Amino acid sequence: MPLIPDSIQSIGVFHVDDPFNPMPDPGDADPETVAFAFFIGIAVVFSLLLITLVCTAAYLVCTSSYEGEYDEELANNGDGSRRGILNFRPLFGKKNSNGLLLDSNFTNPGEFDDNEEFIEREREALIKMSPFEVDSYMRAKEFQIVSPPAVQEFGTYLDSKDLQMIKDRGIQSYYFIPSINDNVDKSGHFLPSFLVQDKLEVEFTRWNKSSSAVLNYPLPYNKKDAVYFEVKVYNHKPNSNSIFSIGLVTVPYPYFRIPGMCKFSIAYESTGKLRINDPFFPSTLLPKLVEGDVVGFGYRFKTGTIFITHNGKKLMDVTQNVSVELFIALGAMNASYTRTYTKDGLLEDPDNIELRNALAEGRELKLSKDIQNPHNPMDETKWDIIDSDEIELHVNLGQTGFVFIEANVKKYGFGSVFGEIGIPPAYNPNDIQKDKLIQKGEELPPQYPEDTENFGLFGNLKIKSHIKNPLKEVSSNPSAPELIQKKLKTPIVKTPKVGIYEFTTPIDRKRETNMQPSINPPVYEINDTRQSSPEITNETISNEETVSSSSKAEPALQHGQSNKTPNKRQNKKTKQRKNKKKGKKNK
């Protein structure tokens, strides 16, 4: 048997031919060693995860404390700003790689540096502006000092009456406030900058210089993830001398400035600019708007994010951590009065710094006269006023379908179209023809019966009285006159017929003698004699004679006197007189 080298023995390898040293079974390895190695690997992984979590928590704690110090510093400013303004810091923007606008104060400069930077930027911008732009900027600045914007927490602007109105009427309660601009002609006639049609359709007129239309109510809480609205460019010429902007503002907002140019406002300009509290020269980040485009704005409640859509596609998230009351605003401005825009539209490269510097320094350039010498509507000597091209914008709050599909699926509209009151009645002629109740109007008034004696002109009416009428029992009997006479024990006077009717009247002797009003008024019955008329007999004539003679024999009552003689004594005297007369005749 050959000898096995020591190197081979050290690693436990044996020849197969050796019957005394067979190959060891690999399954015979120690299981405790394997389990120990497995647990060591798991411990290493969990330790790495724990270290990562600890580092993340430390970073978040440091960042939150840093932000708290920053908020406290801003809250202690001397400008009288409220705590709600702190939620609007992301509206001063620079764009990161993800398309989200971050705070321009991301490096947290001091208060003095911010003021100095703003003053320097304002000085450079005012030199490049036209007289109309400078005047509008100074007026807006003074306007917001006198009437500061109401930066309130979201959901605190409306009172109970407004909330009830929105609940009852739904989207029908929203409308744009009419124009209050101060445009007048030489005669003093009011020239509106824009007209509001059907509550949510705004048309900027040819008299518009620069104005904004603001919605009456802020963005509502619709109990969804977000609230969303869209604006369609219904009328806008390709080479228009007017520009418009669509956005969100706080109130009160300067009515002579378009959205995005004043504090606490954001707007999508038709030139492709995204204006966020920027009255100077913002960057062009969005596509230009033409006739037929649809622009959408959305606000997410949890994160306070505002996002923008264009023709149904989401472009970017603009801000975050916004929790103030915002109102929809539409604005338009005549570009003929500005130095940045031309009458034929926006310059090809509006962000060209060299071009702006050349305009500011007054160099001789081959530019149009509208750029070198913009029109000035405030010059009373020239009356240099250019008609503005009309612009029409339609707002959709959810009364119709959105172009943005997500808003339709998740129901991001402003709420119910007609509220809890419901839809008003329709006055369509086609619907009226199908209405069975309205079609029955041709058969009205109904045909009343001709028998007015039993039915009456106004129907078979019965009147209940609290006074008992002794004639009630005999009023329905055809032999009423005889029964009335027995009931009242008074004779009935029959007057001659007048036409085809005959009147019978009961006489109350007691009432005549005492001159006292009767509790129960006399009843007059009308007997229809068209079929048969009663005959006049000798008894009726004799009764009439006795009644007439007795009435003549009664003495006339004087004023303040009453006849105290009973009726029976008068009857006896009359009988005695008649008997005496008959006795004399017989003699």
Swiss-Prot record:
Protein transport found in the keyword field: yes
Region: Disordered, residue numbers: 509-587
Membrane topology reported for the UniProt record: Single-pass type II membrane protein
Residues spanning the membrane: 34-54
Segments on the Lumenal face: 55-587
Molecular function, one GO term: ubiquitin-like ligase-substrate adaptor activity
Xref: InterPro entries: B30.2/SPRY, B30.2/SPRY_sf, ConA-like_dom_sf, SPRY_dom, Ubq-SigPath_Reg
SUPFAM superfamilies for this protein: Concanavalin A-like lectins/glucanases (SSF49899)
One Pfam family recorded for the sequence: SPRY
Superkingdom: Eukaryota
Keywords: Endosome, Glycoprotein, Membrane, Protein transport, Signal-anchor, Transmembrane, Transmembrane helix, Transport, Vacuole
Cytoplasmic side: 1-33
GO cellular component, one term: fungal-type vacuole
Keyword field contains Endoplasmic reticulum: no
UniProt feature, compositional bias: Basic residues: 566-587
Subcellular location as annotated: Vacuole membrane; Endosome membrane
Glycosylation sites: N105, N208, N321, N334, N527, N538
Function: Components of the endosome-vacuole trafficking pathway that regulates nutrient transport. May be involved in processes which determine whether plasma membrane proteins are degraded or routed to the plasma membrane.
Protein family membership: Belongs to the SSH4 family.
Protein name, per record: Protein SSH4
Organism from which the protein derives: Candida glabrata (strain ATCC 2001 / BCRC 20586 / JCM 3761 / NBRC 0622 / NRRL Y-65 / CBS 138)
